[in-house]
């Protein structure tokens, strides 16, 4: 019984702890369309088994509420190698900020909310 309870908890908790379910929410055509609009774009690569990615997800859940005029785009690194290659992203946990077509900043492995927000603010 304890094992069943533990399994249920391990399944339920991840679905509620991040505030949103991180999925791939764009393709390259959508990215180019948003870039042409001149908007600020934040791209984050992730992997479902990555603890740093999970920590970033918590920050991005709040950031999407705090930066309403910014487009947040996420993709699963190992399942969308075309996106990774086109953007020159080699690692999970990479955060790239664009202002339109111009890359403003790029960091790998940030989990500190202030540092992530500072990176986002560079594109605003």
Regions found by a protein language model. Give the residues of each.
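Sec-dependent N-terminal signal peptides
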Residues: 4-13
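Structural micro-motif
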Residues: 87-96
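Thiol-based oxidoreductase modules, predominantly thioredoxin-like and allied folds used
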Residues: 22, 45, 64, 69-82
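Conserved redox-active cysteine motifs that mediate thiol-disulfide chemistry
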Residues: 45-59
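Short pre-active-site segment immediately N-terminal to redox-active cysteine/selenocysteine motifs
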Residues: 38-41, 45-49, 91
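A short beta-strand-turn-helix
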Residues: 22-40
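Boundary at the C-terminal end of the N-terminal hydrophobic targeting segment
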Residues: 17-21
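Non-catalytic, surface beta->alpha helical segment in thiol-disulfide oxidoreductase systems
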Residues: 99-124
């Amino acid at each position: 019984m304890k094992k069943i309870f533990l399994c249920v908890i391990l399944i339920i908790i991840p679905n509620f702890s991040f505030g949103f379910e991180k999925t791939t929410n764009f393709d390259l055509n959508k990215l180019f369309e948003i870039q042409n609009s001149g908007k600020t774009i934040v791209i984050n690569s992730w992997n479902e088994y990555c603890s740093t990615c999970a920590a970033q997800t918590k920050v991005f859940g709040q950031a999407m509420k705090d930066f309403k005029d910014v487009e947040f785009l996420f993709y699963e690194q190992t399942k969308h190698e075309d996106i990774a290659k086109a953007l020159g992203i080699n690692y999970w946990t990479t955060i790239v900020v664009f202002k339109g077509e111009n890359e403003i900043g790029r960091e790998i492995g940030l989990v500190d909310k202030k540092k992530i927000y500072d990176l986002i603010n560079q594109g605003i």
